[in-house]
A protein has these predicted regions:
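Beta-propeller-forming repeat regions
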Residues: 1-336
Length: 336
């Protein structure tokens, strides 16, 4: 990556998420501490401040089918101070924003939306249901379902579909059994969402080791996703597994320091893994495959002393980007 472009300067930036809405690709970014939230347009470089934020932003996502509606999780402050956290609805009218707390959800951390048959299902995960102090992990988190099509946006109702995952931290979109789905992770492993014939949602086990974050990508071109993990919680190890049909076989392992912000994608048509270190070198790093069977990868530093919290690999037009929320430098950055 030859070019670094600082697109936003945000104190204690935590969230940085790129997504397409209609013809445009946007980046939503926000602070872990301050009431600073912005929407950045890739094609024009235009920045719009999303007003009404209390700070403590963990996630910012678009609502499919509505180009002017977005959902976020805010109110979770370091270190896991989140009794007032919740889901927020952001509506855009021309250049103005209207933000409302849609659901009080203590210790909310991650959210994603699945669209099935034209209906939007919002899933929100909490790291815990209650914490006496930041080190208290005695209570598992919850996974909540909100059917957005059944709401007016004024008052949401949620249904708990799981309350068994301790240190419920990771969430990512992927495809399993031919369907787009969401995976969540924690001490008990990785689980994915499945909808039965009656329309009910449940979680199913995919991997049975403690995982902080995960991403899925076809590294060797055989048409099957490999599993890339940070282990354990906020862990010290990056692992890559291949699914042999009966088990996940580890093919590569390397050290991290407070691993965070794991993502994967393609740069110049080649698979790449991107991950941050939130202690030690604080480096933003990439891993490129040389030989998966032999467990050989090229590890490179994208930027030292960045302290990344979230990263993403994506393409816009003819350009491949790495997006990173470099909290150490208070910057949301594009590399290309």
């Amino acid at each position: 990556m030859n070019t670094k472009q600082v697109i936003l300067e945000i104190e204690s930036v935590y969230t940085a998420n790129a997504f397409r809405v209609g013809p445009e690709i946007y980046i939503g970014a926000g602070s872990e501490t301050k009431p600073e939230v912005y929407l950045y347009t890739i094609t024009t470089g235009e920045t719009s401040q999303v007003t009404g934020s209390p700070g403590g932003m963990m996630s910012f996502i678009p609502v499919p089918g509505n180009p002017d509606m977005f959902v976020s999780i805010m109110g979770l402050f370091p270190p896991f101070v989140g009794g007032e956290a919740g889901l927020f609805l952001h509506r855009r009218t021309n250049r103005d924003w209207h933000t409302t707390r849609a659901l009080h959800l203590p210790f909310a951390h991650r959210c994603e939306i699945l669209n099935r048959d034209g209906k939007n299902f919002l899933f929100a995960a909490t790291v815990s249901t209650y914490k006496e102090n930041p080190q208290d992990w005695s209570n598992p988190g919850e996974l909540h379902l909100i059917k957005l099509d059944d709401t007016t946006g004024a008052s949401w109702e949620s249904r708990v579909i799981d309350n068994s995952i301790t240190r419920n931290h990771g969430m990512t979109r992927t495809r399993i059994n031919g369907h787009e789905t969401i995976c969540i992770s924690g001490r008990e492993g990785i689980f994915y969402l499945e909808q039965d014939a009656g329309g009910d949602w449940r979680i199913k086990s995919l991997f049975e080791k403690e995982v902080s974050e995960m991403t899925f990508i076809d590294l060797d071109g055989d048409g099957q996703y490999e599993l890339v993990t940070i282990e354990p919680f906020h862990g010290e190890t990056l692992n890559i597994y291949k699914n042999t049909g009966s088990e996940w076989d580890i093919r590569f392992s390397d050290s991290l320091s407070f691993g965070h912000g794991l993502s994967s994608g393609f740069v110049k048509q080649k698979p790449v893994i991107v991950v941050g270190n939130r202690s030690g070198s604080m480096a933003l790093e990439s891993f490129h495959i040389l030989d998966l069977k032999g467990g050989k990868f090229n590890r490179a530093v994208i930027e030292e002393d960045a302290g990344p919290t979230q990263t993403q690999v994506f393409s816009a037009g003819d350009t491949d980007y790495v997006l990173s929320a470099n909290q150490r430098k208070n910057e949301a950055v594009l590399y290309y």
